[in-house]
Amino acid sequence: EGGALYQLLSLVDNTGEANTGIIIKGNDYTEKDLPVGTKVIVSLKYAKYDINNDLPQLRMATIFPTQEKVTMKVPQITVSQAGDYVGQYVTVKNLTPAANSTTWVVNKKTTSVNFTDDAELPMVARTTNHAVFANEAIAIKKADLSGIMEIYKGGYQIFPNSMEDVAGFKVE
């Protein structure tokens, strides 16, 4: 919805349980076209399952939106649980950004912001210049961060996608 997931959709069964989501790549829907929480029918007739840099995904799946809307069940997780929630929208609890963090996007280029949790486990937040919060300053404090959990070359990354996702790190 905020532009950070350009041509990516997170498809979940909305139970909030582990291992119930997957990324669908190559679809160019906007929040207006396909609002978060829209129940969909997915045709796999032309779809291809793919693993790209460790991230399981579907390519060329056909999405048929319905008129039915649901309230998303968002799992609250720790960094140690990230591997069970790849492809799902989650909230990661108690993250602290690195002391040198400035804004979500630096120099108008996709940016990784490093975080750690209470156990000092790392989590990377990836943000593209398309995100509505790209130029927002990051407060150096402990808070929760929401977004789509992904994996890239063995490391877990969260893609926040709205101002609400990053609200805990707003500079007051």
Question: What is each stretch, according to the model?
Answer:
Residues 1-172:
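OB-fold nucleic-acid-binding modules
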